[in-house]
């Protein structure tokens, strides 16, 4: 186990997963999908995968520059959710441009408060890079910019939130 692990204290569990669906097999109608625009932190990515699994989000579409889903920190922080959520890498600008019948929401610092929008039953949520946010070209494809209302004094939220 020590040879397989990248941490000083290796877990005593090994898992084998079949690689997930290709992009053309992913169904987005009547469900929520997460799109990641150049997310870099493995811990954030793992947390997003785990949270997606908790809420029943089946698909995460990643830009080609998003951290590798098989990074050891990503895998560990998913707590096995990686085996239940489809993660696919593609050119997200082109992919989003093709999604004409599904609402695209961009998670931004300055947008409509999430508690002020009608509760959608489907849609695509775009989450940006931890330091740069969502690229302007991707933002232009979003029908609505949304944010979580701020109560305290923190400058921003972690991308995984």
Where are these regions (language model features)?
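Short, acidic/turn-prone active-site loops that include or flank metal/cofactor-
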Residues: 1, 65-67, 92, 130-132, ...
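Arg/Lys-rich RNA-binding interfaces used to dock onto structured RNA substrates
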Residues: 1-41
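Short, charged, surface-exposed secondary-structure boundary motifs
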Residues: 4, 95-96, 155-160
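Short, hinge-like loop/turn segments at secondary-structure boundaries
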Residues: 11-13, 77-81, 122-125
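Conserved beta-strand segments that form the floor/walls of ligand-binding pockets within enzyme
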Residues: 14-16, 34-35, 61, 105, ...
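RNA substrate-binding interface of SAM-dependent RNA methyltransferases
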Residues: 25-111
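Structured adenosyl-cofactor binding patch, chiefly the S-adenosyl-L-methionine
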Residues: 51-55, 69-83, 136-161
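Active-site/ligand-binding-proximal alpha/beta "capping" segment
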Residues: 106-154
């Amino acid at each position: 186990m020590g040879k397989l692990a990248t941490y000083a204290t290796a877990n005593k569990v090994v898992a084998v997963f079949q690689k997930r669906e290709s992009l053309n097999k992913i169904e987005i109608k009547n469900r929520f999908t997460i799109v990641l625009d150049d997310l870099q932190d493995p811990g954030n990515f793992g947390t997003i995968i785990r949270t997606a699994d908790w809420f029943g989000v089946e698909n995460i579409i990643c830009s080609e520059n998003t951290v590798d889903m098989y990074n050891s920190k990503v895998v560990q922080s998913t707590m096995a959710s990686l085996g239940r959520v489809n993660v696919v890498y593609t050119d997200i600008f082109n992919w989003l441009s093709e999604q004409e019948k599904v609402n695209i929401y961009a998670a931004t610092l300055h947008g409509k408060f999430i508690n002020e929008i009608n509760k959608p039953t489907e849609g695509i949520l775009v989450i940006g890079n931890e330091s740069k946010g969502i690229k302007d070209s991707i933002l232009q494809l979003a029908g609505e910019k949304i944010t979580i209302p701020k109560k305290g004094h923190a400058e921003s939220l972690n991308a995984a939130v």
